[in-house]
Amino acid sequence: MKTQFAILLIALVLFQLLSQSDAFLSTIWNGIKSLLGRRGLNELDNLDELFDGEISQADIDFLKELMS
């Protein structure tokens, strides 16, 4: 009975590892496909809009308020 329970636990752990690694690897593969795809390289330019290098006076005032 102990052996069967141990085999069941080992099988469950291995199944969980397999299912999680499958999801992880498919996410990596989809990321690679989107980067190397025909439109993937053109859409990387949209990431530049996420960063605004200018800090306004309101931002500085807010940071000072947070620090005090």
Swiss-Prot record:
Keyword field: Amidation, Antibiotic, Antimicrobial, Cleavage on pair of basic residues, Cytolysis, Fungicide, Hemolysis, Membrane, Secreted, Signal, Target cell membrane, Target membrane
Residues of the signal peptide: 1-23
Keyword Secreted included in the entry's annotation: yes
Leucine amide sites (modified residues): 36
Tissue: Expressed by the venom gland.
GO cellular component, one term: extracellular region
Highest taxon in the source lineage: Eukaryota
Compartments where located: Secreted; Target cell membrane
Propeptide regions on this chain: 40-68
Main location: secreted
Protein family according to the UniProt entry: Belongs to the non-disulfide-bridged peptide (NDBP) superfamily. Short antimicrobial peptide (group 4) family.
Protein name: Pantinin-3
The organism of origin for this protein: Pandinus imperator
